[in-house]
From Swiss-Prot:
The lineage of its organism: Bacteria, Bacillati, Actinomycetota, Actinomycetes, Mycobacteriales. Belongs to the phenylalanyl-tRNA synthetase beta subunit family. Type 1 subfamily. This is Phenylalanine--tRNA ligase beta subunit. Binds 2 magnesium ions per tetramer. It comes from Nocardia farcinica (strain IFM 10152). SMART domains: B3_4 (SM00873), B5 (SM00874), FDX-ACB (SM00896). Gene3D superfamilies: 3.30.56.10, Bira Bifunctional Protein, Domain 2 (3.30.930.10), Ferrodoxin-fold anticodon-binding domain (3.30.70.380), Nucleic acid-binding proteins (2.40.50.140), Phenylalanyl-trna Synthetase, Chain B, domain 3 (3.50.40.10).
Length: 834
């Protein structure tokens, strides 16, 4: 937000006469109360080697020069001198008699641009008629600055008139400080920072009226809690906003348009309450606040026809939607050149609905920015009074003695009880007596002092102001006191480090797994902890799939990502897609992180105290209410697993590569992971294996489903794995394998099995039948041709036999091989091939 220093000073000076600060002190004051200053922009006076380089002029004559490629005007301007000043100008938004701002020869504009007399377009131009951009007040180059009639006489020093000795402060208002999106809020923060009195400008200035300004109905589905309206009639459609108002708008980055629009923008900047002005003559019937009808259309003020969503909230009359609630008005009721009757509206909208509507329509507005951050629900009528009074003063209208103010009952904020010395204990600072109560009163809280009946300690009973819904518990109040007293007062004490105990077994296992995946060519990425909206619908999961049971965050950073992840794959796939969209093709990404799995015992709990150790019962209740949070490991493989080069064309990643990563995880964790065929989305049902440890399914691996990949924007044949690391048995120590000094006997065996039998099942059967002499087994050939037989395949394994205490004979090895084949025949129907 941009705001002029003079505007802030004006509000604070109402109760602190003569108060002034330098721009540097103002910058430091904002930073001291926790606001982020983006830029301090000092306006520059027009200087030069003449007494008055910048003056007010009145246009006396205009001659149109038509012999050039673009329209040019030869103007004679009265600048208070005996003779008219002749000036060439290309702008066309002024007429004879208008007051303009002129830089005379010898003047120097901001940026060091010197004005001189020079011949151009066949005439000598003695000066320049200025736009607000050339003066450094705004960014509008489309026309020159035209002052309101009667503003000043020709020859008046325009440096003083335009206030070019001001400073503009630009601040970055974070989402939790929505009340600072106004001069009212910023001035209050400054008053707190400099410990000054503050008088709130948001006050009612017009008498209460029983009559209704306009019929208004609020439908419950709109979630609008307040809608107020005032009417101003008989305004002059040709009126122009005075310079003081235009100047403040320009310095705030808002372009002046007309008195009705300028006043609503001005009051929004001043008080933080967005307003909208309807041309009352264009409204038909009463106003209804409702959700949009399916397929309903609205042409907004940016001249874009929008197809509305059923979740959009609109203001409608008998003809249909006339405004997109909280974001932008409609073109059909726009205040125009002939408007004489204006209906001013101020409402309180649901921030979440405004946020979603703005994102849905890709429509950003100053009103929407404020509603998304919460607007004070108690200043609607005060803002209407201010706007109506200003509009009547500027445009000569009459404020009708009627007011519509429809409210939906909402619960009042609950008082917060806080020990008086809680800020002292948290900060480790002995603040002067009464500091907490004084600081909380400064930010607008209602503060009472009481005594706790149980402990006998003094307490503050604090009711937060309407514009601070973020104050909900004692910790929030402590933060405010510490912030305003100065964080630099808190002593910097380094806590004593506990004696080192080394890594836990779980931490060692996690590191070992991470190293194993990195050695296998993987790149570790931190998986997002929140699920993308609609990801399980993209996968096609059943409605009762356990992964759909998620934990929602009450106040998420992004409303589209409010659910904690029950699986790491969505985040990893999203990271992979983002890298692929930026040119990466061959990826092996992995992540190790906790997932959140709600259970039937998961339930909300009361906040724990921050000023003392919670009781054992409170800790037990908290731990018992938490969802399960096991550590998962997941990986995604896409593109080539082996790069192409002079040695060959390379090799595409396939399910076997995902299984190889599973083996790497198993080896690092010191467990044996078996693989069994499975059908589990988002994996391909024919190329997916469930991962089993000691009879328990701990994860899945294989190639992802083609439909899921297409909907996710990922290449075909992308593979993935995910398994529950905490479900693996924790091996404190591993048995050291016995290394036999005797030679091994190598034999190959080919068996024929049904195509439906998994190779892993055959391997398991061979391993069990081979007994202790079978040291290793590896599949090295798969044949599914005609000679294998219909519906069958041939698998060839390399078997390695070795005895720890003797040299095996060929007969002993053959007997062990035959036993392995017999076990496979019993288990999976394998037939030995010759």
């Amino acid at each position: 937000m941009r705001v002029a220093q003079s505007w802030l000073t004006e509000i604070i000076e109402r109760t602190n006469a003569g108060w002034s600060v330098t721009p540097e002190e103002l910058d430091a004051g904002f930073v001291r109360v926790g606001l982020e200053v983006e830029e301090v922009d000092r306006l520059e006076r027009v200087g030069g080697d003449i007494e008055r380089p910048l003056v007010v002029g009145r246009v006396a004559e205009i001659t149109e020069l038509t012999e050039f490629k673009k329209p040019i005007r030869f103007c004679k301007v009265d600048v208070g001198a005996p003779e008219l000043q002749e000036i060439i100008c290309g702008a066309r938004n002024f007429a004879v008699g208008d007051l303009v701002v002129v830089v005379l020869p010898g003047g120097v504009l901001p940026g060091g641009f010197r004005i001189t007399s020079r011949k151009t377009y066949g005439h000598v131009s003695n000066g320049m008629i200025c736009s607000v951009a050339e003066l450094g007040i705004g960014k509008d180059h489309s026309g020159i600055l035209v002052l309101e009639p009667g503003t000043a006489e020709p020859g008046t020093d325009a440096n003083e008139l335009l206030g070019l000795d001001d400073t503009v402060i630009e601040l970055n208002i974070t989402p939790d400080r929505g009340y600072c999106f106004s001069v009212r809020g910023l001035a209050r923060e400054l008053a707190c920072g400099f410990d000054l009195e503050y008088l709130d400008p948001a006050v009612r200035t017009l008498p209460e009226d029983a009559a209704e300004a306009w019929p208004i109905t609020i439908e419950p589905a709109s979630q609008c809690t307040r809608f107020a309206a005032r009417r101003v009639t008989g305004i002059d459609p040709n009126a122009v906003s005075p310079w003081w108002l235009q100047r403040r708008l320009l310095l705030s980055g808002v372009r002046p348009i007309s008195p009705a629009v300028d006043v609503t923008n001005y009051v929004m900047l001043e008080l933080g309450q967005p307003l909208h002005a309807f041309d009352a003559a264009k409204l038909s019937g009463g106003l209804v606040v409702r959700t949009a009808k399916p397929g309903e259309k609205l042409r907004t003020l940016d001249d874009t026809e929008r197809t509305l969503d059923a979740e959009d909230v609109v203001i409608a009359d008998d003809s249909g939607a006339v405004s997109l609630a909280g974001i932008m008005g409609g073109a059909s009721t726009e205040v125009g050149e002939g408007t004489t009757d204006v209906l001013l509206e101020a409402a309180t909208w649901n921030p979440l609905l405004v946020y979603r509507t703005a994102r849905r329509h890709k429509l950003v507005s100053e009103a929407g920015k404020r509603y998304e951050r919460v607007v004070d629900p108690e200043i609607n009528v005060a803002a209407l009074d201010r706007a109506a009074t200003l509009l009547a003063e500027i445009a000569g209208g009459t404020v009708e003695p009627v007011l519509s103010d429809v409210r939906v009952p909402t619960p009042a904020p609950e008082p917060i009880r806080m020990d008086i010395d809680l800020p002292d204990r948290v900060a480790g600072v002995a603040y002067p007596t009464g500091t907490a109560a004084r600081r909380l009163a400064q930010i607008g809280c209602h503060v009472e002092v009481s005594v706790d009946e149980e402990s006998g300690h003094g307490q503050l009973v604090v009711t937060p102001p309407s514009w601070r819904p973020d104050l909900a518990q004692p910790a929030d109040l402590v933060e405010e006191v510490l912030r305003l007293e100065g964080l630099e007062q808190i002593p910097s004490v380094v806590p004593t480090a506990p004696a080192g105990r080394g890594l836990t077994p779980e931490q060692r296992r996690r590191r070992a797994v991470s190293r194993a995946l990195a050695f296998a060519g993987g790149v570790e990425v931190p998986p997002p902890v929140f699920l993308p909206a609609g990801v399980f619908d993209t996968w096609g999961l059943d409605a009762d799939d356990p992964r759909r049971t998620t934990t929602r965050v009450l106040n998420p950073l992004d409303v589209e990502r409010a659910e904690l992840a029950t699986t790491l794959l969505p985040g990893l796939l999203e990271v992979a897609q983002r890298n692929i969209s930026r040119g990466a093709r061959d990826l092996t990404l992995y992540g190790i992180a906790q997932v959140v799995l709600p259970t039937g015992d998961t339930k909300p709990v009361a906040p724990l105290p921050v000023d003392r150790r919670p009781t054992d019962e409170q800790i037990a209740e908290l731990l018992g209410s938490l969802p399960d949070q096991p550590v998962h490991v997941a990986a995604v493989l896409t593109g080539r697993r082996e790069p192409r080069g002079p040695w060959g064309p390379g090799r595409q990643a396939e399910a076997a590569d995902a299984f190889a990563l599973v083996d790497a995880v198993a080896d690092a964790a010191g467990v044996v992971i078996e693989r069994r065929p499975a059908a589990y989305l988002p994996w391909h049902p024919g190329r997916c294996a469930e991962l089993v440890v000691e009879g328990r399914v701990v994860g899945y691996a294989g190639e992802l489903h083609p439909a899921v990949l297409e909907r996710s924007g990922l290449p075909a044949r992308t593979c993935a794995l995910e398994l529950d690391l905490d479900a693996l048995p924790l091996r404190e120590s591993r048995p050291v394998p016995v290394v036999s000094p005797f030679p091994a006997v190598l034999q190959d065996v080919s068996v024929s099995v049904s195509k439906s039998v998994a190779a892993a099942a055959v391997e398991s059967a061979l391993r069990s039948g081979g007994g202790e002499l079978l040291e290793d087994i590896a599949l090295f050939d798969v044949y599914e041709g005609a000679q294998a037989g219909e519906g069958r395949k041939s698998l060839t394994y390399a078997l390695r036999f070795r005895a720890p205490d003797r040299t095996l004979t060929e007969d002993e090895a053959s007997a062990a091989r035959d036993a392995a084949v017999a076990a496979a025949a019993d288990a999976v129907g394998a037939v030995l091939r010759g």
